[in-house]
Amino acid sequence: MANTLEQFKSITTIVADTGDIEAIKRYQPEDATTNPSLILKAAQIPDYAHLIENAIEWAKTQSSQIDQQVEDAGDKLAVNIGVEILKIVPGRISTEVDARLSFDKAGSIAKAHKLIKLYQEAGIDKSRILIKLASTWEGICAAKELEQEGINCNLTLLFSFAQARACAEAGVYLISPFVGRILDWYKKDTGLEYSATEDPGVVSVTEIYNYYKRHGFNTVVMGASFRNTGEIIELAGCDRLTIGPALLEEMANSQTEVVRKLIPAETTVEAGEPLTEAQFRWEFNENPMAVEKLAEGIRNFAIDQGKLEVMLKEKLTS
């Protein structure tokens, strides 16, 4: 019998949730995703020193202002790591817009254009890039405009049905509904333990998947943020799942039989009118878990972006 990972690959597209090139080589995923926290982690890997140096030297040619150099070096480093990953994966890389732009539609669009330009200058077509944006109202509106320009987006930090519905209605290419972070919140809030089938994160992604398929939305559902392989097994059949190296390793060393759990609807019905901004904000606000986890996720990504910039600034001024 094939191992659990190989069985899973025949049902669901596996995406590596890491910036570690060696891990990506080991598990041979279709795509890869990065975020500010993963870029910060990758920047500590000695084999990546040349990518950092290249970003530093490039940034120095772009501006004489240190703050602009730091910003440019951060963007260039994220792209440099993405370019290396694209030498291995046959599909796409997701590169994230600065979390501090999560409530700035125009700023998010401008940053997306800059990242795409950097990839194109490195010989990478935009068809291999997904621009990651937080699933705020502003992020979703930015993604809608980018999609209309032919720039595909990955809407992340997605914790609620309201966010998922708004993304589909905006014509977003892909969403990353978080599983493990939803579980974390409910375990802390209730003090209970949950089986994989009852896991609130699994239930949330299943609801989103079924809604999309029932109403004929083309937006790809890519479950993210897993705490254990049980969550992953329960989402077999989801369009894609992005999984970290530790859980990929566990799946590769397991013989657990994989049975498809998510199955698309055979017939579709038309969805209702799109959510207005007021409706979105109200529905989202009614979900305390989603409100807390989105805010926390944005803050934490911004903190790690700041840590990366401190490191880059030291190198730029040394």
From Swiss-Prot:
The keyword Thylakoid does not apply. Keywords: Cytoplasm, Pentose shunt, Schiff base, Transferase. GO terms for biological process: carbohydrate metabolic process; pentose-phosphate shunt. GO terms for molecular function: transaldolase activity. The keyword Cytoplasm applies. Belongs to the transaldolase family. Type 1 subfamily. Homodimer. Transaldolase is important for the balance of metabolites in the pentose-phosphate pathway. This is Transaldolase. It comes from Shewanella woodyi (strain ATCC 51908 / MS32).
